[in-house]
Amino acid sequence: LTGHGGLEKLEYRTDLPVPTPEKGEVLIKVGASAVNNTDINTRIGWYSKCVIEQTNAGAFDGFQTINDNDASWSGIPVKFPRIQGADCCGEIVAVGEQVSSDRIGERVLVRTLQQSVMTEAEYSCITYGSECDGGFAQYTKVLATEAFPIRSSLNDAELASFPCAYSTAENMIDRANVKPNDTVLITGASGGVGSAAVQLVKRRHAEVIAICSENKMEQLIALGADKVIPRGRNLLDFLGQDSVDVVIDLVAGKQWPELPDLLRKGGSYTVAGAIAGPIVELDVRTLYLKDLSFLGCTYQPRSVFENLIRYIERSELHPLVAKQYSLKEIKSAQQDFMAKKFVGKLILLPPQ
């Protein structure tokens, strides 16, 4: 990625050196990575507070006006050129100082929201592929503590579908303290995080109400959703006030004002995305009179990814790979991603 903007800012290069792992780091030969909303948002500078449109408004050509100084997850400038890619499944092929050589040959998943890169202070983290180089390459280096061994019969493409989306969903579910028999509403349920949330909520034996486009409803039911509502319908008419315990929101946008009204007293609203637009209206009386909890979810404690690894190794989660591309087809992959005509993840495979 050479700068903020449209697809022209993505360059496929074959002349970059293989990274050298420094103290505490490992070098990973990448088997597969995956496309995520954050790749688009970082490319177009959507995280900048001066951008108020939905993601797709600038997804192809970028936005006319952004502020480079706050256009990243952490609110600091992105250093270009940047290798993106928030997901990575691969094999450790070299280690730096103070890392045991026994780790060479390990199959690993890289944690997306990395804490130990900066500090152990709570809520301080950076995003793999945004504030540091990521998995859209043949090789990547990370701190050894951020490369998690994985033992699974799934292939690299399937495993690469998990890190970013599933850790985001698991963190939201954990923060909301979803319990058996809770009713959970998931917006954007056919996307990477949304479809992950469907599986992870069902894993906790709670009821899932999913919102998605009509042509994806059957796939969401097959995935485990108990009820599916077509996107754009009046949610209060479908469900009634005070009908859900938790909202997992990845969309925001014009329909947002309905969400607090759907929550029961003491309910929790969690958010980790706003692809339909980040600016919403809230009647704060609904918030305090119903004793609601509003939870923004970015930072993830290490336990979230550790739990995700265990779920995968116990075959409790089903990977959703919609399509695979070679790494040099990254522009096509992002175009297809923005078209939203699939359920699950689009995978990028580097040359082997």
Mark where each language-model region is.
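Glycine-rich cofactor phosphate-binding loops and adjacent beta1-alpha1 units
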Residues: I209-C212, E218-D291
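Conserved "cap/hinge" positions at secondary-structure junctions
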Residues: G96, T112-Q114, G188, C212, ...
